[in-house]
Amino acid sequence: MTESKGPDTPGGSAAPKKKRKTLLDRMRPYAIGVMAMVVVFGVSAVIGAHVRGKKDTKVSEPTGAVAAAQRPTAAPTDGASPSPTAAGPKLAIPVKPSAPVTVTVYEDLRSPDSKAFQEEYGAVFKQLLATGQVQFQYRLVTASDKSYGGTGALVAANAAACAQDQSRFTDFVDQVWKNQPTDPKDDGLASEKLMKKLAAKAGKIKTASFDPCIEQLDHEGWVDKSQQDFAAAGYGDVPVVEINGTVVKDVHTSLTPAKLRSQILKEAKRVVTLRTAPTNTPALAG
């Protein structure tokens, strides 16, 4: 009996059987594809984190920001102006600029003390603005984030700077005060959704530019710089008030709206007197 060699093939040998793919062989192309996607997304995340890290250090000043005012100390000579001069980084938001007296208010949008101060002194501030002799500069700080944890003060301050880009700082901050959590440990102001809602309530804020500004924290570096400058000055707790660069005493104890108004008007009178004082320039001989 002869041995069967199967179907006839050249040379009389049997055709090799096709090897069957295992489950691992069938899954290998998909596994490679998934791994490639993981690598791509991983690299993207690293790049994004790197860009975000770089962005945090950039000081992007909001539109109209100004440097700190300094106290006029002498009558004008040789063309020098007795008006408050400015120096240093532009960390203040001015309200009604170009006045003989500059009142600077350091405030933390998450701080109940800052909110209480604005509620108590807001009416007097409006009266003083109406005189045309006073401008206000607001410095936003974030000490409450360090005290209680979270980022509510930072997010709110950045959003206020975004509103300032559209000349809506005061209107937006008014909404922040109205919606500030009663407990400073509550980090509710860290919500981007809330910031967008407050912008809508403030009115006349274009979402096309405001929303990306808060989502990307465009002014985060500026807010951080303001806080660093405030901490380095050793002012203590907010609120802090300056009149032409001089710190007002007893803000947390015996100061009242009437007393502050009196101090501001006294400084305005002093500056006006400096402006009208005769110079020491000798008269030319006829």
Task: Please tell me what each predicted stretch does.
Residues 1, 178-182, 244:
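Short regulatory "switch" loops immediately downstream of catalytic or recognition motifs
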Residues 2-59, 200-286:
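C-terminal cap of thioredoxin/glutaredoxin-like
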Residues 56-123, 127-132, 138-140, 269-286:
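Extracytoplasmic low-complexity, Pro/Thr/Ser/Ala/Gly-rich segments
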Residues 100, 156, 237-238:
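A structure-centric signal for secondary-structure junctions around beta-strands
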Residues 109, 115-193, 279:
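Structural alpha/beta surface segment adjacent to cysteine/selenocysteine redox centers
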Residues 171, 193-194, 209, 259:
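An acidic, carboxylate-rich microenvironment
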